[in-house]
């Protein structure tokens, strides 16, 4: 049909005449399979991912599905240079090559649309797992955005208790808070969380964010930001206090 992609491979003899020509034939088919694998990845992968999203996750709206698609493509292209993703990239390509070589053992022509849809079940299953991962990442990002929006609201509805808070990383990643006169105010800031602190293990990152929200300073100065072990914490503070950090 007009929507199908046909690629026909013709070999002069049905079977190689001798061992040398058999070796040449195998090399030829390997080159053909490699070229077709690259073509399938380049021309089908994004369409297949989009189809999986639209079929399996139709309850997301069109904007959300586009966002999930972009996350899935980022994962599949390994833009984050993740080692495991690199291995999965190689695995997916090898699945396609293996299936093509199996197919060419009994045929020298194929319609790519049919081949992709009916012969590459393992490959499509891998893509479905990537989409599932992209959906999880999307939901986590959405949850994070909603969380940040809520924290920003808490900051906006209260009057600043201090003009400036200086944040310094202390011993064992504890945070020291200073006011505009460089006087330590750490104890004052954490006073209302003292019961929670005495009850169990302390998460100093959460304690810092909670303290800053409670004090709602007009300006936050982060000293030696390179010493902050949790880089996401820095982003959270910047997002909750836009224009103040």
Q: Could you tell me what each predicted segment is?
A:
Residues 1-206:
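Conserved mixed alpha/beta catalytic, RNA-binding, or beta-rich assembly cores of soluble enzyme
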Residues 180-245:
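C-terminal structured domains
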